From Swiss-Prot:
GO molecular function list: (3R)-hydroxyacyl-CoA dehydrogenase (NAD+) activity; 3-hydroxyacyl-CoA dehydrogenase activity; enoyl-CoA hydratase activity; isomerase activity
PROSITE patterns noted in UniProt: ADH_SHORT
Provenance organism: Candida tropicalis
Keyword NADP: yes
Domain free text: Contains two SDR domains.
InterPro entries registered for this protein in UniProt: HotDog_dom_sf (IPR029069), MaoC-like_dom (IPR002539), MFE-2_N (IPR054357), NAD(P)-bd_dom_sf (IPR036291), Peroxisomal_Beta-Oxidation (IPR051687), Sc_DH/Rdtase_CS (IPR020904), SDR_fam (IPR002347)
Region listing for Disordered, in residue ranges: 600-633
Protein name: Peroxisomal hydratase-dehydrogenase-epimerase
Chain intervals for the UniProt region annotation (Short-chain dehydrogenase like 1): 5-228
Length: 906
């Protein structure tokens, strides 16, 4: 296999004075490239300028025998950066859009200035540089572009509405460039790296930063920039030696008859089906897809029109009575239909349009509804728009950001004015109106935002670089607002409509006209504006009677544990990096994604035996060490009642809260508490680890078995702890730690526990100490069908304060400052509390169990709502998941209970 090289290739790297950009520059130069090292040299927040950063990198390249030139221009002056390349080297072949700054702030505090500054550097700078290089790419029939996105761009991130917007916009930009560049051999891709840089050093703990060197990211960038790369329009997640493609997955969705029976009520009735990715019983046209373009709406609407009228029997009531809704761009087209529908469901509608909106208002009033006109331009009059709403109705409940313009043009011919004007309406306008409505939502603890994107934003589209990037930016913005709004009951969702309007008329074929009416989109929007909408941060595609959900799907990927990963590793493992046939994941948050990546990176089954240098005699020496006495835990009915109440028991369930009840009992997960009431628990396995730091421990799974039924409600329990297995995972260790708890007087075995911990930055021997029960090792994958049972479990804002009294006093769960130090916006709920809440919900439905196993896959904040989904897999086994309704994440997965009785009560 011939090595990848960049001989005679000219590479521009923006933001190359440090971090990722610096490392890229050095590596490109080593492989023969002529490098333009661009860096303004400013501070991380974008202030100032200093040429030294770029000069230092160039000096190092030249010292090592490479060729490079420094460039000190702002990325907004992209033509000057390209001019530097052309003057020195004659052309440009590769652009790495890497420059970036941070201006983090919550939605409540973020200013338009902070928002636009980040958009300018990340997105508009990428546009300026790429636009200036495009003619050279076209002329030489060769170009490579790598846009630097981020996990925040994929999933949103608290306090980063600006950054997430820009980073997701770069995805849509890359997709459109890929489509337009195809005939010129111009390949455009995007990466979402988690790497050590000036930016991440300020937000990640040092132990994690050690794993996130730029040397782990560069090999992928080098490959995507090479002549050998044939991939284009693709996205990749990369961190710590993990490389995987991530792509869009679209659910088969639901077809509705597109007639008068298509209402918000029938959408509400079948809403869970829209989100269901089990397509095993669906026809071919409703199978899940992994698309690069909009759906086959011609087939979908044709099939939808064959259906009988929609059945609304049993559908929930949908009402927006007295809700105040602002709909932008509602003077005509989609917005007008939305306004009429919201009014029909009882809302007070403020009809915004930069033209006269009175016609829509008059139609609403004529139909018996209430409406008020607003004639302002969302691009520049956002404050006046919100003021008009408040002056008229005193508040705002729902915001539909619908206003839009098109300025379609091929990228080669697109002007900066055409780029800016589309961005100002779609992206800046959406941010500003959301920002200004936010305080009213927070004050009343209710808000609904529906942001209108486009399939051009999700998949890119020829001739729409401006539109697709802005609409893609709305995705990251919306997901961030959904995360931030969760604690205040502010829900934000995204809709990509396919409908015929005056603005979109030119893109429809003649035979498609009059098939995709705007009123076929409105039923979904009405439901998304209601009190009862169960999701936030979700993306929907809709048109012609079809509604589907769109999410990320990530390949299993490839992992390199080499200290110096080369571009050849990417080349040799490209099939694995882009393989979606097995072990795919659907991450929905930066936490979920990074935890899965961390776990994957740990999975090095090929560690050399020679790394294990412990003397065999150490084991014997350990046995001679003085041992702590096995702890004895004394508990009574007070401890039992306190624990039961923390898991939701009430006075309507006396068996849990009244010690004199004839059926007084404890929820079985009580049996894990001994591990938090004994110092020996951790001490007993710490001696097996080298360089162990308890701050780097993650509780990954927990298995518990009740051996004596029913479990006692008072007594003395003596517990012995023992390791079950230690498994090195690269520079990390997975340890399975066991305990057995017996009655201190009779010696009868009461409980056994197995806790699986993932511990970073330590070493251990690869050793199995004891066998494990089959139930503990079963993966318990959730079936690809609708659950047999589901129930929502509200989590009190104060639950962590109560639950910690049972033993787990970790300040992470109560102290805001400690939580911030751990990079959480506020204290998180105990994982074992989520475990117990789920267990009680299952007991209430199915009856008691004596075995439970679960994997922790996400965090829960007090005040959120859990949704426990359960599947009956056999007479005595119930598989379950626990979701966080507010953020659309999964907190517990790969979980099951084994019932005490013979059969499940279902």
């Amino acid at each position: 296999m011939s090595p990848v090289d960049f001989k005679d290739k000219v590479v521009i790297i923006t933001g190359a004075g440090g971090g990722l950009g610096k490392y890229y520059s050095l590596e490109f130069a080593k492989l023969g490239a002529k490098v333009v090292v661009n860096d303004l040299g400013g501070a991380l927040n974008g202030q100032g300028g200093n040429s030294k950063a770029a000069d230092v990198v160039v000096d190092e390249i030249v010292k090592n025998g490479g060729v490079a030139v420094a460039d000190y221009n702002n990325v907004l002056d992209g033509d000057k950066i390209v001019e530097t390349a052309v003057k020195n080297f004659g052309t440009v072949h590769v652009i790495i859009n890497n420059a970036g700054i941070l201006r983090d702030a919550s939605m409540k505090k973020m200013t338009e200035k902070d928002y636009k500054l980040v958009i300018d550097v990340h997105l508009n700078g990428a546009f300026a540089v790429t636009k200036a290089a495009w003619p050279y790419f076209q002329k030489q029939k060769y170009g490579r572009i790598v846009n630097t996105s981020s996990p925040a761009g994929l999933y949103g991130n608290f306090g980063q509405a600006n950054y997430a917007s820009a980073k997701s916009a770069l995805l849509g930009f890359a997709e459109t460039l890929a489509k337009e560049g195809a005939k010129y051999n111009i390949k455009a891709n995007a990466i979402a790296p988690l790497a050590r840089s000036r930016m991440t050093e300020s937000i990640l703990p040092p132990p994690m930063l050690e794993k996130l060197g730029p040397e782990k990211v560069a090999p992928l960038v080098l490959y995507l920039s090479s002549a050998e790369n044939e991939l284009t329009g693709q996205f990749f997640e990369v961190a710590a030696g993990f490389y995987a493609q991530i792509r869009w997955e679209r659910s088969g969705g639901v077809l509705f008859k597109p007639d008068q029976s298509f209402t918000a009520e029938v959408v509400a009735k079948r809403f869970s089906e829209i989100l269901d990715y089990d397509d095993s019983r669906k026809p071919e046209y409703l199978k899940n897809q992994y698309p690069f373009m909009l759906n086959d709406y011609a087939t979908l609407t044709n099939e939808a029109r064959k259906l009988p009228a929609n059945d609304a029997s049993g559908a929930p009531t949908v009402s927006l009575k007295d809700k105040v809704v602002l709909i932008t761009g509602a003077g005509a087209g989609l917005g007008k239909e939305y306004a009429k529908w919201f009014a029909k469901y009882g809302a007070k509608v403020v009809v915004n349009d930069f033209k006269d909106a009175t016609k829509t208002v008059d139609e609403i009033k004529a139909a018996g509804g209430e409406a008020w006109p607003d004639q302002h331009d969302v691009a520049k009059d956002s404050e006046a728009i919100i003021k008009n709403v408040i002056d008229k109705y005193g508040t705002i409940d729902i915001l539909v950001n619908n206003a839009g313009i098109l300025r379609d043009r091929s990228f080669a011919k697109m002007s900066k004015q055409e780029w800016d004007s589309v961005q100002q309406v779609h992206l800046i306008g959406t941010f500003n109106l959301s920002r200004l409505a936010w305080p009213y939502f927070v004050e009343k603890q209710f808000g609904r935002i529906i942001n209108i994107t486009s399939t051009s934003g999700i998949y890119g589209n020829f001739g729409q670089a401006n539109y697709s990037s802005s609409k893609a930016g709305i995705l990251g913005l919306s997901k961030t607002m959904a995360i931030e709004g969760a604690k205040n009951n502010i829900k934000v969702n995204i809709v990509a409509p396919h409908a015929e309007t005056a603005m979109t008329l030119t893109i429809f074929r003649e035979q498609d006209k009059n098939l995709y009416h705007a009123d076929q989109v409105a039923p979904l929007l009405v439901y998304l504006g209601t009190d009862d909408v169960p999701v936030t941060g979700e993306t929907f595609e809709i048109g012609g009677g079809w509604i589907g959900n769109t999410r990320w799907q990530r390949a299993k990927g490839a992992v390199s544990h080499d200290e110096h990963t080369t571009v050849e590793f990417i080349k040799e493992h490209l099939n694995e990096i882009t393989d979606f046939t097995t072990d795919t994941e659907n991450p929905k948050s930066t936490t979920e994604s990074s935890m899965a990546i961390l776990s994957a990176v740990g999975g090095d089954d090929d560690d050399d035996d020679e790394d294990e240098e412990e003397d065999e005699g150490d084991e014997e020496e350990d046995e001679e060490d003085e041992e702590e006495d096995d702890p004895v835990w004394r508990f009574d009915d007070r401890d039992v009642i306190l624990y039961n109440i923390a898991l939701g028991a009430t006075t309507k369930q006396l068996k849990y809260v009244y010690e004199n009840d004839s059926d007084f009992q404890v929820i079985p997960t009580f049996g894990h508490l001994i591990t938090f009431n004994s110092g020996k628990s951790q001490n007993s396995f710490a001696k097996l680890l080298r360089n162990f730091n308890p701050m780097l421990l993650l509780h990954g799974e927990h298995y518990l078995k009740v051996h004596s039924w029913p479990p006692p409600t008072e007594g003395e329990i003596k517990t012995t702890f023992e390791p079950i297995a230690t498994t090195p995972k690269g520079t990390n260790v997975v340890i399975v730690h066991g305990s057995k708890s017996v009655d201190n007087k009779s010696g009868e075995l009461i409980y056994s526990n197995e806790a699986t911990y993932f511990i970073r930055n330590c070493q251990a021997d690869n050793k199995v100490y004891a066998d494990r029960p089959a139930f503990a090792t079963n993966q318990f994958l959730a079936p690809k069908r609708a659950p047999d049972y589901q129930v929502d479990v509200p989590v009190s804002e104060d639950l962590a304060a109560l639950y910690r009294l049972s033993g787990d006093r970790n300040p992470l769960h109560i102290d805001p400052n400690f939580a911030k130090g751990a990079k959480f916006p506020k204290p998180i709920l105990h994982g074992m509390c989520t475990y117990g809440l789920s267990a009680k919900a299952l007991i209430d439905k199915f009856g008691m169990f004596n075995e439970i196993k679960a994997r922790f896959t996400g965090i829960v904040f007090p005040g959120e709502t859990l949704r426990v989904l359960a599947w009956k897999e056999s007479d005595d086994t119930i598989v379950f998941q626990t979701h966080v309704v507010d953020r659309g994440t999964i907190a517990i997965n790969n979980a099951a209970i084994k019932l005490v009785g013979d059969k499940a009560k279902i």
